[in-house]
Design a protein with these regions (language model features):
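Membrane-cytosol interface segments of multi-pass membrane proteins
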Residues: 1-162
């Protein structure tokens, strides 16, 4: 007769180092994809780097897996407010810093003789970027105050849905 009262669960590691390494290479692929748009490369290299844009999709999937692993391992359900606060604290300070820097550049540009497309950087698009909702309502004429921040907007949407 066994004195075990239930199934034994192996402890989950808090950090998934191999997956962190994979995320690094996915992010590197995305960076190289963006740079290859500016380079003249042989067709084979351009084709390979063009496919690296798929790293964003895999990065999102992997990040979702890691977040689920970290936040759903205990018996108790995670505290939704603490989850959102932790995610906000992780992504928003750097986002705000870059956005304010971009605002400064747009403000200074005419003073130093750099011409900007009329109406390109406007208050509506700035507000959407500030509140991380710019990817929720994309428009063809939308100004990219911080182009890569579309992914933060998509992440924030996923966090709210989590």
């Amino acid at each position: 007769m066994s004195d075990r009262s239930g199934p034994v669960r192996a402890p989950f590691p808090d950090v998934l180092d191999p997956l962190t390494g994979v995320r690094f290479f996915l992010a590197l692929g995305v960076v190289l994809f963006h740079y290859q748009l500016q380079w003249t490369l042989p067709d084979e290299a351009a084709g390979l780097l063009n496919r690296a844009r798929l790293g964003v999709d895999v990065f999102f999937i992997l990040s979702g897996f890691i977040l689920t692993h970290v936040y759903l391992q205990g018996e108790d359900p995670p505290d939704y407010r603490r989850f959102l606060a932790a995610r906000f604290a992780r992504i928003y300070p750097a986002h705000l810093f870059i956005l304010v820097a971009m605002l400064g550049l747009v403000w200074i540009a005419p003073m130093v003789g750099v011409g900007l497309e009329q109406g390109r950087f406007n208050a509506v698009d700035f507000a959407g970027t500030l509140f991380l909702v710019q990817a929720w309502f994309p428009r063809e004429t939308m100004a990219l105050w911080n182009g890569p921040a579309w992914s933060l907007s998509a992440e924030w949407f996923a966090y709210l849905a989590f």
